[in-house]
């Protein structure tokens, strides 16, 4: 029945993929799973209305290309700063600030001398609160002066961070650059991607975090933890196709059992178009 269901929903998956390409906002994430005793990667592309999961032996750019959404997407993609996402420069990018908060918490807990990290965490939360309050008041944007003030504070804290973490000096007798630690790499990232960290503050349609993608991929993590692995690659693909369909059904207020039943009957829900 699994194979039959997976076969019947193929046209719907094509529609979901096209709907995500045409969307203004896309959440992306990836997680490892076990297939035939080997590590394989589940890639998620989703938003509040659609879920699309694919399987690949690779985690990076090639796998994202094969998923066939990001190469054509021109809206805003939210992600955790995994380097291959930046190669898709046809889209705008928003970094997951919840992920950044976790990294900052790690710095705070493990490096008591890093005063900038606590202040930077407070700034991100202050920015989020300012946006949330504005939305509660039915506003569609923050004032230019407010955004400018937060960005200035951002720059000041980056300067403080560098003052507390001077770049390592390479001895003249040794070749190459000296390796930068995790803290300095985080600071470099925050400086380089300031625009992609703060985008949510300037555009209220863009979220602060990537929780949507994390929710949509959570079932895969649970299945991997409980069941161990998939027996075959084709079986894993069928499972992900069905989970894409069920996840999308749930977002449209459709009961999972009903959605699968209609698919097996050869009448899968074609979301946004009606029932085929």
Residue positions per predicted region:
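Catalytic center-proximal scaffold of phosphoryl-transfer enzymes
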Residues: 1-276
């Amino acid at each position: 029945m699994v194979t039959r269901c997976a076969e019947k929903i193929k046209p719907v998956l094509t529609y979901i993929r096209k709907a995500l390409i045409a969307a203004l906002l896309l959440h992306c994430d990836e997680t490892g799973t076990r297939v035939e005793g080997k590590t394989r990667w589940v890639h998620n592309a989703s938003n509040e209305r659609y879920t699309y999961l694919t399987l690949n032996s690779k985690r990076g750019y090639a796998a994202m290309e094969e998923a066939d959404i990001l190469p054509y997407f021109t809206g805003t993609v939210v992600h955790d700063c995994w380097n291959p996402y930046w190669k898709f420069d046809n889209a705008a990018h928003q970094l997951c600030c919840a992920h950044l908060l976790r990294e900052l918490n790690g710095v705070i807990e493990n490096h008591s001398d890093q005063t900038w990290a606590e202040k930077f965490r407070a700034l991100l939360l202050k920015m989020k609160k300012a946006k949330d309050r504005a939305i509660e008041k039915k506003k569609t944007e923050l004032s230019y002066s407010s955004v400018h003030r937060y960005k200035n504070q951002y720059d000041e804290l980056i300067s403080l961070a560098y003052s507390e973490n001077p770049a390592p000096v390479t001895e003249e007798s040794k070749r190459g650059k000296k390796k930068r630690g995790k803290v300095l790499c985080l600071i470099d990232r925050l400086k380089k991607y300031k625009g992609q960290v703060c985008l949510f503050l300037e555009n209220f349609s863009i979220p602060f975090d990537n929780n949507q993608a994390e929710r949509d991929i959570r079932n895969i993590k649970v299945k991997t933890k409980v069941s161990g692995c998939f027996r075959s690659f084709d079986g894993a693909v069928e499972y992900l196709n069905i989970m894409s369909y069920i996840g999308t059904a749930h977002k449209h207020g459709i009961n999972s059992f009903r959605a699968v039943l209609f698919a097996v009957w050869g009448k899968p829900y074609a979301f946004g178009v009606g029932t085929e």
